[in-house]
Structure formats: C-alpha cells, structure tokens
Design a protein with these regions (language model features):
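N-terminal secretory signal peptides that target proteins for export/translocation
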Residues: 1-15
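Bacterial N-terminal signal peptides
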Residues: 18-30
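Sec/Tat signal peptide C-region and signal peptidase I cleavage site
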Residues: 30-36
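Substrate-binding/charge-relay-adjacent region of secreted/lumenal peptidase catalytic domains
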Residues: 37-136, 141, 146-451, 478-538, ...
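Aromatic sugar-binding interfaces of carbohydrate-active proteins
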Residues: 557-596
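Long, intrinsically disordered, low-complexity Ser/Thr/Pro-rich regulatory/activation regions
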Residues: 594-600, 606
C-alpha cells in the first residue's frame, strides 16, 4: 500500500504551502549543504585545475591525510595603510620620518585579540591541533586531517596526478561560519601544488667576445648598429666589483674602497647626516628561500673568499618544518651572492626558509621576515601568474604582510618574471607572449619593488655604457592590484601612470637591472654553485642586485629612509613620461606587448639604478 502525506485530507492551498515548507526543511537538514546559509565566503576559491597541464583526477583525498592550514585574518583599518605611509613622508606630520614597530602595527592594523581568539577557538573545536597565532596577528596556523579541513571549511579535497606527481587541491571554495565573516579572509594550505617558481636562467659564454661586441642579439623590438650603440668591449660575465662599477657604486680603480669614514668603525650608530656613498655595511637584508641551505651558506663563504669580500654573518630561520630539498640551491646561491656582492658588505644576512614552494608555505616565510622586523629589505626571486594567488586567497593575505613591511620601513623586492608580458601557468620559459597577458605575483603587489631585466653593456673597464630591455623581462598591467599613490604622475599627484582605460591598475615593474641574457651570456653573474663557478641570470639576478643596491643607499642614510616605493617615484619628473634622470633610462627593446620608452614603461619601469646619483638625491624622509 502506498501512502500519501496528505491522503486523509483535502489538499488546500494552505496545506500545499505547509507541505512545501516541510519538504524544504527536510531537504535542508538532509542535504550535504544543509548548513549552506550559515557559511560565509572567503577569498579562497576552488583551485583552477583546468590550468594544470597533464592533470588526471584520482579521487577524493584520503580523510586521514595530515594537513597544515594557514588562516588569514582581516587587518583593522586596511584603508589607512597608504595614508599612514603618506604621513610618514610629509614634513610637519607627527609621523614624518618614522616607521612602526611590530607592536604598533598590531595595535592599529592587526586583527584584534578577540578576533584571533575566536578563530583559534573555532579551529580547536573543529578538531585541529597545534593552533597558533602569528605575532603580528595576521594569521593563525593549525594541523588537522583532510576530514577535519573539509568539515571546518565546507570544502572538498581531491587528488590529482600532475606530470607523474600526486597532489591534492580543493575543488570547492573555502568557507567559514558567518560568525567569522569579516574576520577570516582566506584559508591557505588546501593544495600542495607548488605554483611559485624561481626566475633563474642558466647561461653559457659565447664562442668569442667579438661575437657580442658587434651589438646585442635581436630583440622583440630590434635595433642594430648604427642605430644601437656598440660597447667598447663585450663583458659577458660579472663578479661583484664589476656590478659595483657598472651601476656607479664604485670607481674602476677601487671598486670597494669608497666608504665614508663613519662606516669603517665598529658601530653604525654614529650616523648624523647622509653620506655621499657607502657599502651596505650597516644594513641587514633577508632572502625568502626554501629547502636545505647548508651548501648555500658554504657557497657564500667561497664566493666571498674568491672575490675578497668581507664575510657576512648569516642566520637561517625556518618558517616551518625543515625540508631536505636542495633543488633550489642555485637560486639561493644567486640571491645571496649577488645581493651582498653589489652591496660589498651588509651587516647581516637572514634566510627566511619555507618548507616548500607552495603559496601557503612561502607566505609563512614572508610573514616571518616581516614580523621579525630584523631587516631593512628582503628579496623574493620567485613568482607565479597572479591569477593563481588571487584565486587561492594568498594574494590578499600576502598584501597585508607586505603592507606591514612598508609601514615598518622594510622594502621587499621581487623578480618581475622571465616571460615578458605574458604568463604561462606552467612557469617561465623566457619566451614573450607565451601565455595570456598577465603580471607575476608577488611582484605585482603595490608594497613590493618589482624588478625587470635588461641586457647590460659596459666598457672594457666595466663602466656603464647602455642597457637594452631584456625580451623576457616580466611587465605589464596587473589584473587585480590597484596602483598605489606613489606610482602616479608627480606633477598632479592624482593621475596614475597607467591610462585611465586601465582604471588605475598597478604597473609592473618599478625598476630593472641586468638579467644576463637568454641563452648566451651578456651580463651574467659568475657565482658559486655547489662549490663550482657557474653563470646564471634572469630576473632572479636583477632582483637581488636591486636589493643590494638599496642596502648601500640605506646604509648611507643610516637606515632611516623607510619603504623605497614612494621615494623612488618622487625622483620622477612628472607627467606625461615620469622620466627620472637619476635612473639609467632604458629606451630600447621590448617584452612582447610593451616597448621600452623614455621615462616609465612596462618593461623596465623607471630604469636601472645609478647608485651614486640616487643615493645623493633620494628624498630624505627623516628629520634633519
């Protein structure tokens, strides 16, 4: 016998409505998304698996799989970050010439203690263990199983085979209870796909120097002699003193001897006024790295002995579980040797080391560098197409960290990528336009100095001759980041660099330096890798060179300059070209969609550092 819910009664409109409500309630309590109305969205979307090449679905991730998650918290007063930076640059303002301590940042910008505790309690109640909050109160870490993660964040986790490796990722967005809406902005660690890659190019010397002495190799926007100047000699590989000479940090006669008297003592505390030139002796710098750096530290010592450089004190800080991975040794060798090399000396070098190259793990290393507040600059020679960190939520959290760095007077540097104006999802290959137009992150963050690449030509004694834009130099217009106030025409102070049709989007890069060539060496770095000499290049070279250049300038000003972004754009002349006579303006070459032009462009930014000139004219943001 079949029964009807309404068998004994006549079906009236009132009963029909009651039945409909009943079925909806029944469905609500029996559906997998029964509590959908109680969840709030975060910035973490479903992983864009369609962009993974050679990806094959395996099935649901085993519920017992151990996972480590990073929960990003919404900072307070987010709309006051740039106004505060502007106040720090404004004479007469009470904040003029200052920077925040970590404690001051937490008070004004960090999530509140009540919010942090609410997130920690939720995670603990959900079954997570080892729940800890970062000192700057921007994130909370926790360990849990896949089952706990899926339940706590109303998401699904799947396994995929990608190029023979098994990875997991979230196939649904991450959500949190509505009670945490506006508190949690992102949930990281829901995938272990290593999206970030280094921007390093290995190079070889040409058959003879005369092969390059006849002018540069053809570029996207080619020029050939007599249109292009011809250097007096072709210098294919560079040591630290060579870069110092080329970028006007030292004279050919004594590349490392030009040091102010105050900087030769045992203390850097005797600063009283800007010096005309110095080494980076009084400035601590950092490098965001990954894996086991045992050999990297040894290689730095070998490099210092090879080039008669002062030995730099080194500290390795793990931002997670120590990893035995050594696949990135050449990258971290390049970063450490060229940055301290062009600086000639720094007071201390810190490696902030991630467990892996995933967004979540590298984010922890970045946060360690920022919240430790030990350095005045740090380098990131890696990146990825910015739509990945936008979709997984790491962009919004990392931008909070970079904003904190700027407020604390720290300048992050990042490679603009090695794929010209495009960005292929599988990583850089040095081929412009191979992929859709996009910029690389973290370079596109407004609180990071994005560094593009050039081909540098010097005279026989390594003095500067000219530069041409490297055809693989990353650059363009961000799809997701807005232009900060300093990346604007200084004439009016309101019109952004990018055209109004781009709605004030962030332009990349900010500056550029030698990237070394694509296949044949043009200005490649001669470094030590695993105890032996090797030639390398890419924007992985130009970024640490820029950080080392900034270290010299900071030391010359007693580490009182603060975040570099607003300062370097103040050197520009204003609309319409934003030309800066204090940088080496690069006006030849291109990167695919964009061409190097007089003034600012989306290939080389403002140009390359003339260290001596910039050091002399950079706006002093501290009381005299």
């Amino acid at each position: 016998m079949q029964f009807s819910l309404f068998q004994a009664k006549k079906v009236t409109p009132k009963l029909r409505l009651s039945a409909l409500v009943g079925w909806l309630l029944l469905a609500a309590f029996t559906s997998p998304n029964a509590l959908a109305q109680t969840w709030a969205s975060t910035a973490t979307k479903a992983y864009p698996v369609q962009y993974l090449k050679n990806a094959t679905a395996i099935g649901s991730l085993a519920p017992s799989t151990a996972m480590h998650v990073v929960v990003g918290l919404q900072e307070q007063n987010a709309n006051q970050v740039q106004p505060t930076l502007r106040a720090m640059l404004t004479p007469g303002n009470s904040l003029y010439g200052t920077s925040l301590t970590v404690a001051q940042f937490v008070t004004k910008f960090g999530a509140t203690t009540a919010q942090v505790n609410a997130v920690k309690s939720y995670l603990s109640d959900a079954g997570f263990t080892d729940v800890t909050a970062a000192d700057n109160q921007l994130l909370v870490e926790a360990d849990g199983t896949a089952a706990v993660v899926q339940s706590a964040f109303n998401t699904t986790l799947e396994e995929y085979s990608v190029n023979g490796a098994t990875v997991y990722l979230n196939t649904a967005p991450a959500q949190v209870p509505t009670s945490l809406s506006g508190v949690v902005i992102a949930v990281l660690g829901l995938n272990n796909v290593a999206g970030l890659h280094s921007d390093l190019t290995k190079l070889s010397l040409s058959a003879s120097a005369t092969k390059l002495s006849q002018g540069p190799r053809p570029l996207t926007d080619p020029c050939t002699p007599p249109d292009c100047p011809v250097p007096a000699a072709a210098n294919e590989s560079y040591g630290p003193q060579d870069y110092q000479i080329a970028y006007d940090a030292a004279s050919p006669a004594a590349a490392s001897a030009v040091t102010p008297a105050w900087a030769t003592g045992t203390s850097c505390s005797s600063f009283t006024a800007p010096q005309l030139l110095s080494t980076g002796k009084c400035t601590a710098v950092g490098i965001i790295a990954e894996g086991d750096l045992t050999q990297v530290v040894k290689d730095l010592v070998t490099y210092e002995k090879t080039y008669a450089l002062p030995e730099v004190p080194v500290t390795v800080v793990n931002a997670g579980i120590a990893s035995p991975d050594t696949s990135g040794e050449d990258e971290w060798d390049l970063d450490s040797q060229t940055s301290t090399g062009i600086a000639n000396q720094v007071s201390h070098l810190y490696f902030y080391v991630a467990t892996s190259m995933t967004d979540s793990d590298l984010g922890l290393a970045i946060n360690k560098a920022v919240s430790s507040n030990q350095v005045k600059a740090f380098n990131m020679s890696f990146g990825e197409c910015e739509f990945f960190p936008y979709l997984d939520g790491s962009m919004v959290l990392d931008d909070e960290m970079f904003g904190e760095a700027a407020l604390q007077g720290i300048t992050p540097f990042a490679s603009a990528d090695d794929n010209g104006s495009a960005c292929p999802s599988e990583g850089p290959n040095g081929v412009p336009l191979d992929g859709p137009p996009d910029t690389s992150y973290p370079a596109s963050s407004p609180y990071v100095i994005a560094v593009g690449g050039t081909n540098l030509f010097t005279n026989a004694n390594f003095t500067y001759d000219y530069e041409i834009a490297w055809e693989a130099s990353g650059g363009g217009i961000s799809l997701f980041e807005n232009s900060p106030f300093w990346q604007a025409y200084t004439g009016s102070g309101t019109e952004p660099i990018v055209l109004s049709t781009e709605n004030g989007s962030r332009g990349v890069p900010d500056v550029a330096m030698c990237a070394g060539g694509t296949e044949l060496s043009i200005c490649a770095a001669n470094i030590i890798v695993d105890g032996s000499a090797e030639l390398v290049g890419g924007t992985s070279l130009s970024s640490p060179l820029s950080m080392g250049s900034w270290a010299r300038i900071e030391s010359s000003h007693g580490n009182k300059l603060g975040f570099a972004g607003p300062l370097i754009y103040q050197l520009a002349n204003g609309a319409p070209t934003l030309s800066s006579p204090d940088f080496n303006d690069v006006i030849l070459g291109g990167n695919g969609l964009f061409t190097a032009l007089p003034g600012y462009d989306y290939v080389t930014g403002l140009g390359s550092w003339d260290i001596k000139v910039v050091n002399k004219v950079i706006p002093t943001t501290y009381p005299q």
